[in-house]
Amino acid sequence: MESPRIHGGAEEKSSCESGWTMYIEDTFHGNHHSEVVYEEEDDGFSVKEVDDDGDGDEDDDDDDDDDSSNNESDDSMTSDASSWPSTHQPPRSTKNHAAAKNSNAKQVNNQTENRVRDRFSDEGEESELKARTRTTAASRVKVSKTK
């Protein structure tokens, strides 16, 4: 597809440039012949074409050809976003997902507590470990004070 625009002298054309790219660039740079205006109506939005002089008349010539394309908008370049449902519906299994998530969290907490309990199965071992730690720390303090 050949681009209708001319930028200065000769136009460089990329081999990967498509018709869509040229269409979008032409529209972006203001090289289009009409613009699309979305008007809000009671039942949603409608598309209205505005010509270059901005008066809203789509047909400037005086011929009376009855063409059905003048009455309908050209939606070929319109986004497919209108095909999605208008209301968002949450997944049906939201409650089940939340319950499973809570169950998994409780299971992880229980496993962690069990590991701690296994590590110190006897309260005597736990208190003995604390006493060793205190003794070692106190002896380090004494040694550093004597120097």
Curated annotation (Swiss-Prot):
Skewed-composition ranges (Polar residues): 78-93
Motif placement: SOFL-B: 76-85
Location(s) in or outside the cell: Cytoplasm; Nucleus
Stretches for region Disordered: 32-147
The keyword Cell division is assigned to this record: no
Disruption phenotype: No obvious developmental defects. Plants missing both SOLF1 and SOLF2 have reduced endogenous cytokinin levels and accumulate lower levels of trans-zeatin riboside monophosphate (tZRMP) and N(6)-(Delta(2)-isopentenyl)adenosine monophosphate (iPRMP), biosynthetic intermediates of bioactive cytokinins as well as decreased response to exogenous cytokinin in both callus-formation and inhibition-of-hypocotyl-elongation assays.
Family designation: Belongs to the SOFL plant protein family.
The protein's role, per its UniProt record: Involved in cytokinin-mediated development. Together with SOFL2, triggers the endogenous content of specific bioactive cytokinins derived from the biosynthetic intermediates trans-zeatin riboside monophosphate (tZRMP) and N(6)-(Delta(2)-isopentenyl)adenosine monophosphate (iPRMP) such as N-glucosides trans-zeatin 7-glucoside (tZ7G), cis-zeatin 7-glucoside (cZ7G) and N(6)-(Delta(2)-isopentenyl)adenine 7-glucoside (iP7G).
Protein name: Protein SOB FIVE-LIKE 2
Organism: Arabidopsis thaliana (Mouse-ear cress)
Gene, per the UniProt record: SOFL2
